[in-house]
Amino acid sequence: MPSDPEEDYIPWIQQLCELFGHDYFVQVSQDFIEDDFNLTGLSSQVPYYREALYTILDYQVETAEDHNTDNTTTNTSNNNDSRNGTSKRNASELPNKALLAHSAELLYGLIHARYIVSKQGLTAMASKFERNDFGSCPRYFCDGMHLIPVGSTDVPGQETVRLFCPCCNDIYIPSSSRYLNIDGAFFGTTFPGLLVKMFPEIENQCRIRITKFSQNDFGLKLFGFKINELSATGPRMKWLRMHPETEGEKQELTHVNIMFQLATYMKTKRMEEDDEEEEDEVEEEDDDRTMASE
């Protein structure tokens, strides 16, 4: 007995996440995508945004190839379309299938970066982290600490995905080349820090490893003598893996974090004020031109 075509149908999001090398992704819920607030600002970053969004949501989208096929229909059907009030878009305004697929994947990646910093998305990514889907840190003293995907920038097209270790605070290139085509912006810069703060057990795992190996830090030696850090060949990244031990150091770290957050807030506020001033200047120039023309 033949199977129902609807039962065999696989949603677009599921197909994308099951592609080779796409197992870092989680499936974004349709409710999240259909909320316009979650898509704010993405229309300017993705070509054929509307068509790409419809593709992700499994709506039928007309492409340039479909338009060329429709041109072979009879004049009778065209007359019926005009009587029914439907209109055909010009072929030059429609994306081809390859461009539409690229735009849909780009849009999904940018939505994915926003989804994984939501409560639902963090929970889904935490499950993958717990299963070690992202791999383990290659550093010996991290004792197989699970890695977290991260992007060095939130702008797509700049750099591919990297893996962050919360234990040594360093980043690594994925060991398999199949992940080197995944854009880092699809995970963003915020996700790793938010995941660590939302799930304190990750910091507890790091603390156990740090305590375990704190007395056995490896250092290069020549004939039994350690190489001085000020030497040209001395260690350079030891500070990156230092953690506060005394109560005073912990308070100092807390103070530095607060000051950093305050500085970031002030910088963002200053940039917003500058943008408002530029908009006011542009409006004044437009008013002056209007008055001059009158």
Swiss-Prot record:
Q: Which Gene Ontology BP terms does the record give? A: DNA damage response; nucleolar large rRNA transcription by RNA polymerase I; regulation of cell cycle; regulation of ribosomal protein gene transcription by RNA polymerase II; regulation of transcription by RNA polymerase I; regulation of transcription by RNA polymerase III
Q: Which InterPro entries match?
A: Casein_kin_II_reg-sub_N, Casein_kinase_II_beta-like, Casein_kinase_II_reg-sub
What's the protein here called?
A: Casein kinase II subunit beta
Q: Which UniProt keywords apply?
A: Phosphoprotein
Q: Quaternary structure per UniProt? A: Tetramer composed of two alpha chains, one beta chain and one beta' chain.
Q: What does this protein do?
A: Regulatory subunit of casein kinase II/CK2. As part of the kinase complex regulates the basal catalytic activity of the alpha subunit a constitutively active serine/threonine-protein kinase that phosphorylates a large number of substrates containing acidic residues C-terminal to the phosphorylated serine or threonine.
| Domain of life according to the entry | Eukaryota
Acidic residues bias locations = 273-288
GO MF terms listed in the record are:
protein serine/threonine kinase inhibitor activity
According to the record, the segments passing through the membrane are none
Query: Which Pfam families does this chain map to?
Result: CK_II_beta
Record GO cellular component, one term: UTP-C complex
Q: PROSITE patterns this protein is in?
A: CK2_BETA
Q: Which family does it belong to?
A: Belongs to the casein kinase 2 subunit beta family.
User: How would you describe the post-translational modification of this protein?
Assistant: Phosphorylated by alpha subunit.
Give me the ranges of the annotated region Disordered.
66-90, 269-294
Q: Ranges of Low complexity compositional bias?
A: 70-87
